[in-house]
UniProtKB/Swiss-Prot annotation:
NCBIfam families: PPR (TIGR00756). Residues 519-549 are annotated as: Type E(+) motif. Keywords: Repeat. Residues 443-518 are annotated as: Type E motif. This is Pentatricopeptide repeat-containing protein At2g44880. The gene is PCMP-E9. Pfam families: E_motif, PPR, PPR_1, PPR_2. InterPro entries: E_motif, Pentatricopeptide_rpt, PPR_At4g14850-like_plant, TPR-like_helical_dom_sf.
Length: 555
Protein backbone atom coordinates (compact mmCIF):
# COMPACT_ATOMS: atom_id res chain seq x y z
CA UNK A 1 0.00 0.00 0.00
CA UNK A 2 2.83 2.41 0.91
CA UNK A 3 4.70 1.47 -2.27
CA UNK A 4 1.57 2.10 -4.32
CA UNK A 5 1.13 5.52 -2.69
CA UNK A 6 4.76 6.45 -3.43
CA UNK A 7 4.48 5.34 -7.05
CA UNK A 8 1.14 7.00 -7.81
CA UNK A 9 1.24 10.21 -5.75
CA UNK A 10 3.84 12.68 -7.03
CA UNK A 11 3.82 14.68 -3.77
CA UNK A 12 4.59 11.61 -1.66
CA UNK A 13 7.15 10.37 -4.21
CA UNK A 14 8.94 13.74 -4.17
CA UNK A 15 9.17 13.77 -0.37
CA UNK A 16 10.47 10.19 -0.44
CA UNK A 17 13.05 11.27 -3.06
CA UNK A 18 14.30 14.16 -0.90
CA UNK A 19 14.62 11.90 2.16
CA UNK A 20 16.47 9.29 0.08
CA UNK A 21 18.93 11.90 -1.22
CA UNK A 22 19.97 12.90 2.32
CA UNK A 23 19.67 9.51 4.05
CA UNK A 24 20.83 7.03 1.40
CA UNK A 25 22.66 9.13 -1.16
CA UNK A 26 22.15 11.32 -4.19
CA UNK A 27 22.93 8.44 -6.56
CA UNK A 28 20.04 6.37 -5.21
CA UNK A 29 17.71 9.39 -5.39
CA UNK A 30 18.67 9.98 -9.03
CA UNK A 31 18.02 6.30 -9.83
CA UNK A 32 14.51 6.62 -8.37
CA UNK A 33 13.98 9.85 -10.31
CA UNK A 34 15.07 8.31 -13.64
CA UNK A 35 12.72 5.34 -13.14
CA UNK A 36 9.79 7.72 -12.94
CA UNK A 37 7.88 7.70 -16.28
CA UNK A 38 6.64 11.29 -15.80
CA UNK A 39 9.62 13.48 -14.87
CA UNK A 40 8.37 16.85 -16.09
CA UNK A 41 6.44 17.71 -12.94
CA UNK A 42 7.96 21.01 -11.74
CA UNK A 43 7.77 20.14 -8.01
CA UNK A 44 9.51 16.80 -8.58
CA UNK A 45 12.16 18.12 -11.00
CA UNK A 46 12.94 21.18 -8.88
CA UNK A 47 13.37 18.96 -5.83
CA UNK A 48 15.89 16.79 -7.68
CA UNK A 49 17.79 19.86 -8.92
CA UNK A 50 17.83 21.25 -5.37
CA UNK A 51 19.06 17.89 -4.01
CA UNK A 52 22.15 18.26 -6.21
CA UNK A 53 22.64 21.78 -4.87
CA UNK A 54 22.38 20.64 -1.26
CA UNK A 55 24.90 17.83 -1.82
CA UNK A 56 27.27 20.32 -3.53
CA UNK A 57 27.17 18.50 -6.85
CA UNK A 58 26.66 21.72 -8.76
CA UNK A 59 27.54 20.53 -12.31
CA UNK A 60 24.94 17.74 -11.99
CA UNK A 61 22.21 20.28 -11.22
CA UNK A 62 22.91 22.01 -14.56
CA UNK A 63 23.21 18.69 -16.40
CA UNK A 64 19.82 17.58 -15.05
CA UNK A 65 18.23 20.87 -16.09
CA UNK A 66 19.58 20.47 -19.64
CA UNK A 67 18.42 16.83 -19.82
CA UNK A 68 14.93 17.74 -18.65
CA UNK A 69 14.68 20.51 -21.25
CA UNK A 70 15.77 18.13 -24.04
CA UNK A 71 13.93 14.96 -23.05
CA UNK A 72 10.70 16.14 -21.38
CA UNK A 73 8.17 18.93 -21.44
CA UNK A 74 9.60 20.38 -18.23
CA UNK A 75 8.87 24.12 -17.94
CA UNK A 76 11.21 25.90 -15.50
CA UNK A 77 9.70 28.28 -12.97
CA UNK A 78 11.08 30.87 -10.55
CA UNK A 79 12.09 28.16 -8.06
CA UNK A 80 14.15 26.42 -10.78
CA UNK A 81 16.07 29.59 -11.60
CA UNK A 82 16.68 30.69 -8.00
CA UNK A 83 18.13 27.22 -7.30
CA UNK A 84 20.33 27.28 -10.40
CA UNK A 85 21.62 30.84 -9.79
CA UNK A 86 22.65 29.76 -6.29
CA UNK A 87 24.37 26.70 -7.76
CA UNK A 88 26.27 29.00 -10.16
CA UNK A 89 27.29 31.33 -7.32
CA UNK A 90 28.65 28.51 -5.19
CA UNK A 91 30.48 26.75 -8.02
CA UNK A 92 31.78 30.00 -9.61
CA UNK A 93 30.71 28.69 -13.04
CA UNK A 94 30.75 31.99 -14.95
CA UNK A 95 29.96 30.45 -18.36
CA UNK A 96 27.01 28.51 -16.93
CA UNK A 97 25.85 31.69 -15.21
CA UNK A 98 25.80 33.65 -18.46
CA UNK A 99 23.84 30.87 -20.16
CA UNK A 100 21.43 30.73 -17.25
CA UNK A 101 20.82 34.49 -17.40
CA UNK A 102 19.87 34.19 -21.08
CA UNK A 103 17.42 31.38 -20.15
CA UNK A 104 15.89 33.63 -17.50
CA UNK A 105 15.36 36.32 -20.15
CA UNK A 106 13.93 33.78 -22.57
CA UNK A 107 11.35 32.48 -20.11
CA UNK A 108 10.41 35.98 -18.92
CA UNK A 109 11.53 35.76 -15.28
CA UNK A 110 13.62 38.96 -15.24
CA UNK A 111 10.84 40.83 -13.47
CA UNK A 112 10.62 38.20 -10.73
CA UNK A 113 12.17 39.70 -7.61
CA UNK A 114 13.52 36.40 -6.25
CA UNK A 115 15.06 35.30 -9.54
CA UNK A 116 16.58 38.73 -10.22
CA UNK A 117 18.02 38.85 -6.70
CA UNK A 118 19.66 35.49 -7.44
CA UNK A 119 21.12 36.94 -10.66
CA UNK A 120 22.49 40.00 -8.81
CA UNK A 121 24.05 37.77 -6.15
CA UNK A 122 25.48 35.43 -8.80
CA UNK A 123 27.22 38.22 -10.73
CA UNK A 124 28.40 39.83 -7.48
CA UNK A 125 29.99 36.52 -6.41
CA UNK A 126 31.69 36.32 -9.83
CA UNK A 127 33.11 39.82 -9.25
CA UNK A 128 31.23 41.10 -12.33
CA UNK A 129 29.87 44.16 -10.58
CA UNK A 130 28.85 45.93 -13.79
CA UNK A 131 26.52 43.03 -14.69
CA UNK A 132 25.30 42.84 -11.09
CA UNK A 133 24.47 46.56 -11.06
CA UNK A 134 22.65 46.34 -14.42
CA UNK A 135 20.52 43.44 -13.18
CA UNK A 136 19.82 45.37 -9.96
CA UNK A 137 18.84 48.57 -11.81
CA UNK A 138 16.45 46.64 -14.09
CA UNK A 139 14.51 45.17 -11.16
CA UNK A 140 11.01 46.67 -10.85
CA UNK A 141 10.90 45.69 -7.18
CA UNK A 142 13.79 45.09 -4.80
CA UNK A 143 13.90 43.40 -1.43
CA UNK A 144 16.34 43.95 1.39
CA UNK A 145 18.12 40.79 0.18
CA UNK A 146 18.59 42.38 -3.28
CA UNK A 147 20.29 45.43 -1.75
CA UNK A 148 22.40 43.22 0.52
CA UNK A 149 23.58 41.08 -2.42
CA UNK A 150 24.81 44.11 -4.39
CA UNK A 151 26.37 45.88 -1.39
CA UNK A 152 28.16 42.67 -0.32
CA UNK A 153 29.52 42.31 -3.85
CA UNK A 154 30.98 45.82 -3.81
CA UNK A 155 32.53 45.12 -0.39
CA UNK A 156 34.16 41.90 -1.62
CA UNK A 157 35.61 43.79 -4.60
CA UNK A 158 37.01 46.50 -2.32
CA UNK A 159 34.71 49.23 -3.69
CA UNK A 160 33.72 50.54 -0.28
CA UNK A 161 32.67 53.99 -1.47
CA UNK A 162 30.01 52.51 -3.78
CA UNK A 163 28.97 50.03 -1.09
CA UNK A 164 28.66 52.79 1.50
CA UNK A 165 26.65 55.00 -0.87
CA UNK A 166 24.20 52.15 -1.58
CA UNK A 167 24.03 51.34 2.12
CA UNK A 168 22.96 54.92 2.87
CA UNK A 169 20.38 54.81 0.02
CA UNK A 170 18.67 51.62 1.24
CA UNK A 171 14.95 52.38 1.64
CA UNK A 172 14.40 49.48 4.03
CA UNK A 173 15.10 49.25 7.73
CA UNK A 174 18.57 47.74 7.70
CA UNK A 175 18.95 44.39 9.43
CA UNK A 176 21.95 43.03 11.29
CA UNK A 177 23.17 41.06 8.24
CA UNK A 178 23.78 44.14 6.07
CA UNK A 179 25.23 46.08 9.02
CA UNK A 180 27.67 43.24 9.70
CA UNK A 181 28.64 43.03 6.01
CA UNK A 182 29.28 46.79 5.75
CA UNK A 183 31.16 46.84 9.05
CA UNK A 184 33.32 43.90 7.94
CA UNK A 185 34.23 45.82 4.78
CA UNK A 186 35.39 48.83 6.81
CA UNK A 187 37.32 46.57 9.21
CA UNK A 188 39.16 44.83 6.38
CA UNK A 189 40.12 48.20 4.89
CA UNK A 190 41.39 49.41 8.29
CA UNK A 191 38.74 52.14 8.58
CA UNK A 192 37.79 51.53 12.19
CA UNK A 193 36.24 55.00 12.58
CA UNK A 194 33.52 54.16 10.03
CA UNK A 195 33.16 50.65 11.43
CA UNK A 196 32.67 52.05 14.94
CA UNK A 197 30.08 54.54 13.67
CA UNK A 198 27.99 51.67 12.28
CA UNK A 199 28.54 49.60 15.42
CA UNK A 200 27.23 52.43 17.61
CA UNK A 201 24.23 52.94 15.28
CA UNK A 202 23.06 49.33 15.60
CA UNK A 203 20.17 48.65 17.93
CA UNK A 204 20.64 44.88 17.74
CA UNK A 205 24.13 43.39 17.77
CA UNK A 206 25.01 39.73 17.33
CA UNK A 207 28.13 37.87 18.49
CA UNK A 208 29.42 38.30 14.91
CA UNK A 209 29.03 42.09 15.23
CA UNK A 210 31.11 42.28 18.40
CA UNK A 211 33.73 39.82 17.16
CA UNK A 212 34.18 41.71 13.87
CA UNK A 213 34.95 44.91 15.78
CA UNK A 214 37.34 43.13 18.16
CA UNK A 215 39.18 41.64 15.18
CA UNK A 216 39.40 45.10 13.58
CA UNK A 217 40.90 46.74 16.67
CA UNK A 218 43.42 43.91 17.01
CA UNK A 219 44.46 44.45 13.39
CA UNK A 220 45.19 48.15 13.95
CA UNK A 221 47.08 47.30 17.18
CA UNK A 222 44.53 48.97 19.47
CA UNK A 223 44.43 46.00 21.81
CA UNK A 224 42.95 48.01 24.70
CA UNK A 225 39.90 48.99 22.63
CA UNK A 226 39.53 45.36 21.55
CA UNK A 227 39.61 44.15 25.16
CA UNK A 228 37.06 46.76 26.28
CA UNK A 229 34.62 45.48 23.66
CA UNK A 230 35.40 41.87 24.56
CA UNK A 231 34.68 42.54 28.24
CA UNK A 232 31.44 44.36 27.32
CA UNK A 233 30.09 41.50 25.17
CA UNK A 234 26.76 40.22 26.53
CA UNK A 235 27.49 36.78 25.08
CA UNK A 236 30.68 35.17 23.76
CA UNK A 237 31.28 32.13 21.61
CA UNK A 238 34.50 30.25 20.84
CA UNK A 239 35.24 32.49 17.84
CA UNK A 240 35.15 35.57 20.12
CA UNK A 241 37.62 34.01 22.56
CA UNK A 242 39.87 32.83 19.72
CA UNK A 243 39.88 36.31 18.18
CA UNK A 244 40.88 38.02 21.43
CA UNK A 245 43.52 35.39 22.31
CA UNK A 246 44.96 35.63 18.80
CA UNK A 247 44.87 39.43 19.02
CA UNK A 248 47.11 39.42 22.09
CA UNK A 249 49.62 37.12 20.40
CA UNK A 250 49.49 39.20 17.21
CA UNK A 251 50.24 42.34 19.25
CA UNK A 252 53.22 40.90 21.15
CA UNK A 253 51.38 40.41 24.44
CA UNK A 254 51.76 36.64 24.81
CA UNK A 255 51.21 36.57 28.56
CA UNK A 256 47.83 38.25 28.23
CA UNK A 257 46.94 35.72 25.51
CA UNK A 258 47.82 32.84 27.84
CA UNK A 259 45.90 34.40 30.75
CA UNK A 260 42.81 34.77 28.58
CA UNK A 261 43.13 31.19 27.34
CA UNK A 262 43.26 29.99 30.95
CA UNK A 263 40.31 32.24 31.85
CA UNK A 264 38.28 30.68 29.03
CA UNK A 265 38.97 27.21 30.41
CA UNK A 266 38.19 28.22 33.99
CA UNK A 267 34.99 30.22 33.38
CA UNK A 268 33.29 28.59 30.36
CA UNK A 269 32.32 25.14 29.15
CA UNK A 270 33.81 25.85 25.73
CA UNK A 271 36.25 23.28 24.37
CA UNK A 272 39.26 24.72 22.52
CA UNK A 273 39.35 23.90 18.80
CA UNK A 274 42.24 23.88 16.34
CA UNK A 275 41.97 27.67 15.91
CA UNK A 276 42.30 28.17 19.69
CA UNK A 277 45.37 25.95 19.78
CA UNK A 278 46.91 27.74 16.79
CA UNK A 279 46.22 31.08 18.52
CA UNK A 280 47.73 30.22 21.90
CA UNK A 281 50.76 28.15 20.82
CA UNK A 282 52.77 31.18 19.58
CA UNK A 283 52.22 32.80 22.99
CA UNK A 284 53.44 29.64 24.71
CA UNK A 285 56.52 29.64 22.46
CA UNK A 286 57.27 33.30 23.21
CA UNK A 287 57.04 32.84 26.98
CA UNK A 288 58.62 29.39 27.18
CA UNK A 289 55.57 28.00 29.02
CA UNK A 290 56.54 24.40 28.26
CA UNK A 291 54.12 22.72 30.72
CA UNK A 292 51.18 24.51 29.12
CA UNK A 293 52.53 23.58 25.69
CA UNK A 294 52.66 19.92 26.73
CA UNK A 295 49.07 20.18 27.98
CA UNK A 296 48.06 21.56 24.56
CA UNK A 297 49.85 18.66 22.87
CA UNK A 298 47.96 16.10 25.00
CA UNK A 299 44.69 17.92 24.31
CA UNK A 300 45.38 17.87 20.56
CA UNK A 301 46.01 14.12 20.67
CA UNK A 302 42.91 13.46 22.77
CA UNK A 303 40.69 15.44 20.39
CA UNK A 304 42.31 13.85 17.30
CA UNK A 305 43.43 17.29 16.09
CA UNK A 306 46.93 15.92 15.42
CA UNK A 307 45.77 14.83 11.96
CA UNK A 308 45.79 18.48 10.91
CA UNK A 309 49.08 19.59 9.36
CA UNK A 310 48.87 23.17 10.68
CA UNK A 311 48.31 22.00 14.25
CA UNK A 312 51.22 19.51 14.13
CA UNK A 313 53.45 22.21 12.65
CA UNK A 314 52.54 24.64 15.43
CA UNK A 315 53.20 21.99 18.11
CA UNK A 316 56.65 21.12 16.74
CA UNK A 317 57.43 24.84 16.41
CA UNK A 318 56.47 25.33 20.07
CA UNK A 319 58.68 22.45 21.25
CA UNK A 320 61.67 23.66 19.24
CA UNK A 321 61.33 27.22 20.60
CA UNK A 322 61.08 25.83 24.14
CA UNK A 323 64.33 23.91 23.60
CA UNK A 324 62.74 20.46 23.24
CA UNK A 325 64.18 19.78 19.80
CA UNK A 326 63.98 15.96 20.12
CA UNK A 327 60.24 16.14 20.78
CA UNK A 328 59.87 18.49 17.83
CA UNK A 329 61.77 16.05 15.59
CA UNK A 330 59.61 13.13 16.75
CA UNK A 331 56.43 15.01 15.83
CA UNK A 332 57.94 15.98 12.47
CA UNK A 333 58.89 12.38 11.68
CA UNK A 334 55.43 11.07 12.65
CA UNK A 335 53.50 13.59 10.54
CA UNK A 336 51.60 11.66 7.83
CA UNK A 337 51.66 14.74 5.62
CA UNK A 338 54.07 17.66 5.59
CA UNK A 339 53.70 21.11 4.08
CA UNK A 340 56.43 23.66 3.34
CA UNK A 341 55.63 25.33 6.68
CA UNK A 342 56.34 22.03 8.50
CA UNK A 343 59.81 21.75 6.94
CA UNK A 344 60.46 25.43 7.65
CA UNK A 345 59.54 25.05 11.33
CA UNK A 346 61.84 22.05 11.78
CA UNK A 347 64.78 23.67 9.96
CA UNK A 348 64.30 26.86 11.98
CA UNK A 349 64.05 24.79 15.17
CA UNK A 350 67.44 23.21 14.51
CA UNK A 351 68.84 26.68 13.77
CA UNK A 352 67.52 28.15 17.04
CA UNK A 353 68.91 25.25 19.03
CA UNK A 354 72.41 25.62 17.56
CA UNK A 355 72.34 22.51 15.36
CA UNK A 356 73.27 24.16 12.06
CA UNK A 357 74.44 20.97 10.37
CA UNK A 358 71.16 19.14 11.09
CA UNK A 359 69.26 22.17 9.73
CA UNK A 360 71.23 22.14 6.48
CA UNK A 361 70.93 18.36 6.10
CA UNK A 362 67.16 18.60 6.51
CA UNK A 363 67.08 21.45 3.99
CA UNK A 364 68.83 19.25 1.41
CA UNK A 365 66.24 16.51 2.04
CA UNK A 366 63.43 19.04 1.75
CA UNK A 367 64.56 20.15 -1.71
CA UNK A 368 63.89 16.62 -2.98
CA UNK A 369 60.28 16.66 -1.75
CA UNK A 370 59.18 20.32 -1.63
CA UNK A 371 60.03 23.64 -3.22
CA UNK A 372 61.65 25.97 -0.62
CA UNK A 373 60.21 29.45 -0.14
CA UNK A 374 61.60 32.70 1.30
CA UNK A 375 60.90 31.54 4.86
CA UNK A 376 62.88 28.34 4.24
CA UNK A 377 65.87 30.34 3.06
CA UNK A 378 65.69 32.64 6.07
CA UNK A 379 65.79 29.56 8.33
CA UNK A 380 68.78 28.20 6.37
CA UNK A 381 70.75 31.47 6.59
CA UNK A 382 69.82 31.71 10.30
CA UNK A 383 71.26 28.22 10.79
CA UNK A 384 74.47 29.30 9.05
CA UNK A 385 74.57 32.39 11.26
CA UNK A 386 74.13 30.44 14.50
CA UNK A 387 76.70 27.88 13.37
CA UNK A 388 79.23 30.42 12.09
CA UNK A 389 79.09 28.85 8.61
CA UNK A 390 80.05 31.95 6.62
CA UNK A 391 80.79 30.30 3.27
CA UNK A 392 77.58 28.26 3.31
CA UNK A 393 75.59 31.33 4.31
CA UNK A 394 77.04 33.28 1.38
CA UNK A 395 76.31 30.40 -0.99
CA UNK A 396 72.65 29.99 -0.05
CA UNK A 397 72.07 33.75 0.02
CA UNK A 398 73.29 34.04 -3.58
CA UNK A 399 71.52 30.83 -4.70
CA UNK A 400 68.14 32.31 -3.72
CA UNK A 401 67.90 34.28 -6.96
CA UNK A 402 68.63 31.16 -9.02
CA UNK A 403 65.75 29.48 -7.18
CA UNK A 404 63.40 32.30 -8.23
CA UNK A 405 63.23 33.72 -4.70
CA UNK A 406 63.72 37.39 -3.84
CA UNK A 407 65.78 38.19 -0.76
CA UNK A 408 63.82 40.33 1.68
CA UNK A 409 65.15 42.68 4.34
CA UNK A 410 65.17 39.81 6.87
CA UNK A 411 67.57 37.81 4.66
CA UNK A 412 69.88 40.82 4.32
CA UNK A 413 69.73 41.41 8.07
CA UNK A 414 70.70 37.82 8.79
CA UNK A 415 73.62 38.01 6.34
CA UNK A 416 74.85 41.29 7.87
CA UNK A 417 74.79 39.63 11.29
CA UNK A 418 76.61 36.54 9.97
CA UNK A 419 79.34 38.59 8.27
CA UNK A 420 79.65 40.94 11.25
CA UNK A 421 80.10 38.10 13.73
CA UNK A 422 82.80 36.64 11.46
CA UNK A 423 84.65 39.98 11.35
CA UNK A 424 83.95 40.64 7.65
CA UNK A 425 82.93 44.21 8.45
CA UNK A 426 83.69 45.70 5.03
CA UNK A 427 81.58 43.07 3.28
CA UNK A 428 78.78 43.58 5.79
CA UNK A 429 78.87 47.37 5.34
CA UNK A 430 78.87 47.00 1.55
CA UNK A 431 75.81 44.75 1.84
CA UNK A 432 74.03 47.39 3.93
CA UNK A 433 74.96 50.12 1.42
CA UNK A 434 73.90 48.14 -1.67
CA UNK A 435 70.78 46.39 -0.38
CA UNK A 436 67.57 47.39 -2.23
CA UNK A 437 65.94 48.54 1.03
CA UNK A 438 66.63 51.16 3.63
CA UNK A 439 68.28 49.31 6.55
CA UNK A 440 66.14 49.02 9.65
CA UNK A 441 67.19 49.54 13.27
CA UNK A 442 67.79 45.82 13.86
CA UNK A 443 70.32 45.59 11.01
CA UNK A 444 72.16 48.75 12.08
CA UNK A 445 72.27 47.68 15.75
CA UNK A 446 73.60 44.27 14.72
CA UNK A 447 76.35 45.87 12.64
CA UNK A 448 77.22 48.33 15.43
CA UNK A 449 77.58 45.38 17.80
CA UNK A 450 80.04 43.76 15.38
CA UNK A 451 81.98 47.05 15.13
CA UNK A 452 82.19 47.08 18.92
CA UNK A 453 83.38 43.50 19.04
CA UNK A 454 86.17 44.19 16.53
CA UNK A 455 86.98 47.71 17.85
CA UNK A 456 86.24 49.42 14.50
CA UNK A 457 85.48 52.98 15.64
CA UNK A 458 85.44 54.53 12.17
CA UNK A 459 82.70 52.24 10.86
CA UNK A 460 80.76 52.51 14.10
CA UNK A 461 80.73 56.32 13.77
CA UNK A 462 79.40 56.12 10.21
CA UNK A 463 76.64 53.68 11.06
CA UNK A 464 75.62 55.41 14.31
CA UNK A 465 74.44 58.48 12.38
CA UNK A 466 71.95 56.32 10.43
CA UNK A 467 70.97 54.37 13.54
CA UNK A 468 70.21 57.55 15.50
CA UNK A 469 68.01 58.85 12.68
CA UNK A 470 65.96 55.65 12.80
CA UNK A 471 65.93 55.02 16.55
CA UNK A 472 67.01 58.16 18.44
CA UNK A 473 65.91 56.70 21.79
CA UNK A 474 67.66 53.32 21.49
CA UNK A 475 70.37 53.59 24.14
CA UNK A 476 72.18 50.41 23.01
CA UNK A 477 73.54 52.04 19.86
CA UNK A 478 75.04 54.97 21.80
CA UNK A 479 76.51 52.72 24.49
CA UNK A 480 78.43 50.66 21.93
CA UNK A 481 80.17 53.72 20.48
CA UNK A 482 80.62 55.31 23.90
CA UNK A 483 82.40 52.19 25.17
CA UNK A 484 84.64 52.18 22.09
CA UNK A 485 85.61 55.80 22.80
CA UNK A 486 86.32 54.94 26.44
CA UNK A 487 88.53 51.99 25.46
CA UNK A 488 90.43 54.34 23.12
CA UNK A 489 90.61 57.04 25.86
CA UNK A 490 88.76 59.56 23.67
CA UNK A 491 87.05 61.20 26.62
CA UNK A 492 85.77 64.27 24.74
CA UNK A 493 83.97 62.02 22.25
CA UNK A 494 82.77 59.88 25.15
CA UNK A 495 81.17 62.97 26.74
CA UNK A 496 79.71 64.08 23.40
CA UNK A 497 77.86 60.73 23.04
CA UNK A 498 76.50 61.07 26.57
CA UNK A 499 75.18 64.55 25.74
CA UNK A 500 73.50 63.30 22.55
CA UNK A 501 71.90 60.47 24.55
CA UNK A 502 70.54 62.98 27.05
CA UNK A 503 69.29 65.29 24.28
CA UNK A 504 67.50 62.44 22.48
CA UNK A 505 66.13 61.05 25.77
CA UNK A 506 67.64 57.65 25.03
CA UNK A 507 66.57 55.16 27.66
CA UNK A 508 67.68 51.67 28.49
CA UNK A 509 65.01 49.07 27.75
CA UNK A 510 63.93 47.53 31.02
CA UNK A 511 64.96 43.89 31.39
CA UNK A 512 62.48 41.20 32.33
CA UNK A 513 62.40 37.48 32.98
CA UNK A 514 59.62 34.89 32.85
CA UNK A 515 59.04 31.71 34.82
CA UNK A 516 56.25 29.12 34.51
CA UNK A 517 54.98 27.15 37.52
CA UNK A 518 51.82 25.00 37.42
CA UNK A 519 50.79 26.42 34.02
CA UNK A 520 51.02 30.00 35.37
CA UNK A 521 53.55 32.32 33.73
CA UNK A 522 54.95 35.05 36.01
CA UNK A 523 56.90 38.06 34.79
CA UNK A 524 59.61 39.89 36.76
CA UNK A 525 60.66 43.35 35.59
CA UNK A 526 63.88 45.05 36.67
CA UNK A 527 63.16 47.83 39.17
CA UNK A 528 59.43 47.00 39.34
CA UNK A 529 57.83 48.55 42.44
CA UNK A 530 54.23 47.68 41.51
CA UNK A 531 54.32 43.87 41.67
CA UNK A 532 51.57 42.70 44.08
CA UNK A 533 53.95 40.17 45.73
CA UNK A 534 57.07 42.37 45.78
CA UNK A 535 57.55 42.06 49.58
CA UNK A 536 57.55 38.26 49.43
CA UNK A 537 59.82 38.31 46.38
CA UNK A 538 62.36 40.56 48.12
CA UNK A 539 62.29 38.39 51.25
CA UNK A 540 62.96 35.23 49.21
CA UNK A 541 65.72 37.00 47.27
CA UNK A 542 67.29 38.12 50.55
CA UNK A 543 67.25 34.54 51.88
CA UNK A 544 68.79 33.26 48.64
CA UNK A 545 71.56 35.87 48.75
CA UNK A 546 72.35 34.98 52.37
CA UNK A 547 72.48 31.29 51.45
CA UNK A 548 74.77 32.02 48.49
CA UNK A 549 77.09 34.06 50.73
CA UNK A 550 77.19 31.29 53.34
CA UNK A 551 78.06 28.74 50.65
CA UNK A 552 80.69 31.18 49.31
CA UNK A 553 78.97 31.02 45.92
CA UNK A 554 80.87 33.13 43.37
CA UNK A 555 78.29 35.44 41.85
Amino acid sequence: MLRHAIETNVQIFTKFLVISASAVGIGYARKLFDQRPQRDDSFLSNSMIKAYLETRQYPDSFALYRDLRKETCFAPDNFTFTTLTKSCSLSMCVYQGLQLHSQIWRFGFCADMYVSTGVVDMYAKFGKMGCARNAFDEMPHRSEVSWTALISGYIRCGELDLASKLFDQMPHVKDVVIYNAMMDGFVKSGDMTSARRLFDEMTHKTVITWTTMIHGYCNIKDIDAARKLFDAMPERNLVSWNTMIGGYCQNKQPQEGIRLFQEMQATTSLDPDDVTILSVLPAISDTGALSLGEWCHCFVQRKKLDKKVKVCTAILDMYSKCGEIEKAKRIFDEMPEKQVASWNAMIHGYALNGNARAALDLFVTMMIEEKPDEITMLAVITACNHGGLVEEGRKWFHVMREMGLNAKIEHYGCMVDLLGRAGSLKEAEDLITNMPFEPNGIILSSFLSACGQYKDIERAERILKKAVELEPQNDGNYVLLRNLYAADKRWDDFGMVKNVMRKNQAKKEVGCSLIEINYIVSEFISGDTTHPHRRSIHLVLGDLLMHMNEEKYNW
